[in-house]
Amino acid sequence: AYCNELIQPIIIPFVPEKGKTVICDFENDELGKAYGMTGGSQAVVENDPDGKSGKALHVGTDDNKAAYSHPKFNVKLPEGRKLGDYVNLTIDMRIVNEDGIYGAGMRVFINGKEFNVGMNAKTFGCNPNTWNRGAVISLNSATAPGFILPDEMKGLTEFELAVGSASGGAQYFLDNIVMHYELPG
């Protein structure tokens, strides 16, 4: 019995390497800086309307709603990281009034390829004129909110990312766009 205890296998727990890459938090941007859009309207850096978290990106306006148009971000991942290492994308989102809270749902675009995350901004956790902080979109699950990243995109280290509410009349704020990675330990 004593010898059996000596030759028992040692279980080494799996400890994945986890981390995050901040895509955009807008704090280093000048007020009024414009980001490109996938279609019409505009995306401009403004102060957080609640005055609590510095700067945020205002997508659409009262007079020029974002109609199925989303802000675009040029992403260059840190050295050694590729898109397939990332398990999710988190965003802070604040819908103005109810502009785009329902619509056709939340969307993510990678190099122009559209992914439907399976829910609209309301079911994603947004309420009018209130921040929904740290909302998670999975990059490796078809369960909403999420999608399966295609194999051919997993090796990307630079790409164009767009994210937002697909609606004929959207207006919202985005902040703290962050991607989280997880690698085998």
Model-derived features: positions:
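Short carbohydrate-recognition loop motifs
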Residues: 44-69
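Extracellular carbohydrate-recognition regions
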Residues: 5-40, 185
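Beta-strand acidic-aromatic groove motif in beta-rich domains, primarily in extracellular
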Residues: 69-71, 97-112
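Extracellular carbohydrate recognition
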Residues: 152-155, 164-180
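Extended extracellular/luminal ectodomain segments enriched in beta-structured repeat modules
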Residues: 80-90, 101, 156
